[in-house]
Curated annotation (Swiss-Prot):
Classification via InterPro entries: D1/D2 (IPR055266), Photo_II_D1/D2_sf (IPR036854), Photo_RC_L/M (IPR000484), Photo_RC_L/M_CS (IPR055265), PSII_D1 (IPR005867)
Gene behind this protein: psbA
Name of the featured protein: Photosystem II protein D1
Family: Belongs to the reaction center PufL/M/PsbA/D family.
Positions annotated as propeptide: 345-353
Length: 353
């Protein structure tokens, strides 16, 4: 009898836990995805802060030339970064217990792999948590779909690209100048500026900014007046009010006359879907582009594509970009190899004798 009561009590305790986890009455929704999200993101954040402040230099290229990234080793907020895991480790799973000592783990850049893998798992769970909360509230799932764009972008630069290149040392450093270095080297090795998927991403980001500014300014300019001249226009809105707070007909008429009639949305729902879809699709394409360039399917190459009747090259902007790419390539990892891959790939002329 006692055993039965104890089992029922433990079941009710588990039931209470399940109800608490999935309750939409909590100030912050946890959810089953949150059970995994919270520890992974806390781990990634904690290790990032500690490593950014105090991690020793890391042998990123695997040639016994460690690179400093932390504040206590001479960096500032701009130059500091979590240095990627050493090329000597490659794509191996490198937890602390795989190293002979903590010093060796730090020297080989173990914190980078720990942070990145926990972070990617955490943001994926955050996306799942968005879907889970939407489901509990009877909402449509598009919030999680929109968040999939930055999740895809982060996965591309932190996981897919290192897999394609064969080493976590090729992943994006976790810092400001490290991000810029990653971008410059990526351009040098993959000509990303000439990749159509990157172009779509640029159109998505800049276009999304433009459309957001246009929408916000149109709405703000066509508010229905509810206040006097001496009050803020924002005081004319009450949270949860049923009536429209701005005149969509006026906004539609203004923009239709500014550009042309069919450039202006007359349906608020389709307008807001467009505002969400444009940048999301653009960033999806950029993430896909990074993932293809990870396996060296690079941007377009129009170098020396224009010649005169004598066969002499007439330089175009593509050739100027190529010259810049070569310059960037010979300067990065300058002690790791004698020649950049593009220059070393030329066949040696055969000799007679």
């Amino acid at each position: 009898m006692t055993a039965i009561l104890e089992r029922r009590e433990s079941e009710s305790l588990w039931g209470r836990f399940c109800n608490w986890i999935t309750s939409t009455e909590n100030r912050l929704y946890i959810g089953w995805f949150g059970v995994l999200m919270i520890p992974t993101l806390l781990t990634a954040t904690s290790v990032f802060i500690i490593a950014f402040i105090a991690a020793p230099p890391v042998d990123i290229d695997g040639i016994r030339e460690p690179v400093s990234g932390s504040l206590l080793y001479g960096n500032n907020i701009i130059s500091g970064a979590i240095i990627p895991t050493s090329a000597a480790i490659g794509l191996h799973f490198y937890p602390i217990w795989e190293a002979a000592s903590v010093d060796e783990w730090l020297y080989n850049g173990g914190p980078y792999e720990l942070i990145v893998l926990h972070f990617l798992l955490g943001v994926a769970c955050y996306m799942g948590r968005e879907w889970e909360l939407s489901f509990r509230l009877g909402m449509r799932p598009w919030i999680a779909v929109a968040y999939s764009a930055p999740v895809a972008a982060a996965t591309a630069v932190f996981l897919i690209y290192p897999i394609g290149q064969g080493s976590f040392s090729d992943g994006m450093p976790l810092g400001i100048s490290g991000t810029f270095n990653f971008m410059i080297v990526f351009q040098a090795e993959h000509n990303i500026l000439m990749h159509p998927f990157h172009m779509l991403g640029v159109a998505g980001v800049f276009g999304g900014s433009l459309f957001s500014a246009m929408h916000g300014s149109l709405v703000t300019s066509s508010l229905i007046r509810e206040t006097t001249e001496n009050e803020s226009a924002n005081e004319g809105y009450r949270f949860g009010q049923e009536e429209e707070t701005y005149n969509i007909v006026a906004a539609h008429g203004y923009f239709g006359r500014l550009i042309f009639q069919y450039a202006s949305f007359n349906n608020s729902r389709s307008l807001h879907f467009f505002l969400a879809a444009w940048p999301v699709v653009g960033i999806w394409f950029t993430a896909l582009g990074i993932s293809t360039m990870a396996f060296n399917l690079n941007g377009f190459n129009f170098n020396q594509s224009v010649v005169d009747s004598q066969g002499r090259v007439i330089n175009t902007w593509a050739d100027i970009i190529n010259r810049a790419n070569l310059g960037m390539e010979v300067m990065h990892e300058r002690n790791a190899h004698n020649f950049p891959l593009d220059l070393a790939a030329v066949e040696v002329p055969s000799t007679n004798g």
